[in-house]
């Protein structure tokens, strides 16, 4: 694991109470355009689901239950936990124009619209049909998803992150900081100042005598 990933996990992002999550990555140009600092957008009511109960991840094969693409199966390519959204590759699409100017109508592209978590279901790998799941523990203590109909374990898929890295298959390179080195405690707190530490390390003896200073 890279040191930047560890620092990202340690950081805590804070957002405005009027901030509204969307399809764009938080902090991107498109997100800043939709959420300017002066905007006061009405908050969106979202069904609270804990991280322990959430069971849809990028790379999962699911089937759509509602909408124009009901009955079709596709792969989850994006999950927006703050809105309970999932985006399927090539499904539930709508068409829009980009690059529109005064003299050019723009280019029409297909864009996937998000679906709520209750509008899709995981596909059972045994019969390729939608199924309910339960979280259970294996004999080794691993928490897995189990189909309630067939009892088959549905493993979490290995899906690359935004930078193209699959954490489960990543191997550290010569320029990567290992987890052991990043977590190693090398700093020893001391009451001395930086100047006193440098003088002690270099063997510098202070021979000057400072005059008294009075504070009024």
Swiss-Prot record:
Superkingdom of source: Eukaryota
Keyword Chloroplast: no
Record keywords: Mitochondrion, Phosphoprotein, Ribonucleoprotein, Ribosomal protein, Transit peptide
GO molecular function terms listed in the Swiss-Prot or TrEMBL record: RNA binding; structural constituent of ribosome
Location in the cell: Mitochondrion
Stretch forming the transit peptide: 1-9
KOW domain span: 56-89
One of the record's GO cellular component terms: mitochondrial large ribosomal subunit
One Pfam family here: ribosomal_L24
Keyword Cytoplasm among UniProt keywords: no
Positions of modified residues (Phosphoserine): 24
HAMAP family linked to this entry: Ribosomal_uL24_B
Annotated family: Belongs to the universal ribosomal protein uL24 family.
Assembly information from the UniProt record: Component of the mitochondrial ribosome large subunit (39S) which comprises a 16S rRNA and about 50 distinct proteins.
Protein name from the UniProt record: Large ribosomal subunit protein uL24m
Species of the source: Mus musculus (Mouse)
Source taxonomy: Eukaryota, Metazoa, Chordata, Craniata, Vertebrata
């Amino acid at each position: 694991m890279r040191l930047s990933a560890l620092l990202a996990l340690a950081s805590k992002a804070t957002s405005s109470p009027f901030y509204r999550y969307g399809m764009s990555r938080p902090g991107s140009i498109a997100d800043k355009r939709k959420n300017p600092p002066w905007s006061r957008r009405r908050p969106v009511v979202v069904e609270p689901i804990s991280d322990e109960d959430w069971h849809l991840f990028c790379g999962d094969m699911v089937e759509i239950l509602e909408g124009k693409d009901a009955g079709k199966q596709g792969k989850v390519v994006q999950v927006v936990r703050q809105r309970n959204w999932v985006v399927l590759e090539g499904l539930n699409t709508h068409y829009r124009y980009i690059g529109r100017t005064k003299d050019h109508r723009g280019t029409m592209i297909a864009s996937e619209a998000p679906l709520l978590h209750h509008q899709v279901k995981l596909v059972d790998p045994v019969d390729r049909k939608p199924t309910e799941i339960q979280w259970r523990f294996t004999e080794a203590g691993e928490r897995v998803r189990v189909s309630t109909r067939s009892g088959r374990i549905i493993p979490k898929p290995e899906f690359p992150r935004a930078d193209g890295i699959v954490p489960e298959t990543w191997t550290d390179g010569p320029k990567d900081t290992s987890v052991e080195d990043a977590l190693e405690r090398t700093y020893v707190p001391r009451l001395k100042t930086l100047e006193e530490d440098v003088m002690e390390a270099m063997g510098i003896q202070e021979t000057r005598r400072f005059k008294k200073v009075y504070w009024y």
